[in-house]
A protein has these predicted regions:
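Non-catalytic, surface beta->alpha helical segment in thiol-disulfide oxidoreductase systems
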Residues: 100-128
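A short beta-strand-turn-helix
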Residues: 22-40
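Short pre-active-site segment immediately N-terminal to redox-active cysteine/selenocysteine motifs
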Residues: 38-41, 45-49, 92
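Structural micro-motif
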Residues: 88-97
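Thiol-based oxidoreductase modules, predominantly thioredoxin-like and allied folds used
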Residues: 45, 64, 69-83
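Typically the conserved alpha-helix immediately C-terminal to a functionally engaged Cys/Sec
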Residues: 54-67
């Protein structure tokens, strides 16, 4: 069943991303590589049509710009790779997971994460 209003909302939110930027998505191989890169890493486990996930894209893009080469911020679409999502204990979309320089998970958040709260959590975890 198609819900026209929901479809229109997803399209409207997606259209706003092109103006505000987006964060690249990883495949399973890319996920493995990024977690061994010895850089701070933020992965949003979500999906391309999940409304809160789409809403997070401008926040993630702003964080990537703010941290530059000090951190890698990426998407991982659990809708495409359920096995890997299970391995990371992802139960809800979106879930943002922060990994330290060794690839160890240091914090996670479920749902939309406002930028100021996200920055505060990253600083508390050690990424400044």
């Amino acid at each position: 069943m198609f819900f026209p209003r929901l479809g229109a909302l997803v399209l409207a939110l997606s259209a706003g991303l092109s103006a505000q930027g987006h964060v690249p998505a990883l495949d399973p191989r890319g996920l493995s590589q990024i977690l061994t890169s010895k850089k701070w890493t933020v992965i949003e486990f979500g999906g391309p049509t999940c409304v809160p996930c789409v809403k997070m894209q401008p926040v993630l893009a702003e964080l990537q710009q703010a941290f530059g080469s000090r951190a890698q911020i990426r998407n991982f679409y659990v809708t495409h790779y359920a096995k890997e999502a299970q391995a990371h204990k992802i139960m809800v979309m979106p879930t943002q997971v922060v990994f330290d320089l060794t690839g160890k998970e240091v914090t996670r958040h479920i749902g939309y994460w406002p930028k100021d709260e996200f920055l505060s959590a990253l600083a508390k975890a050690g990424l400044k």
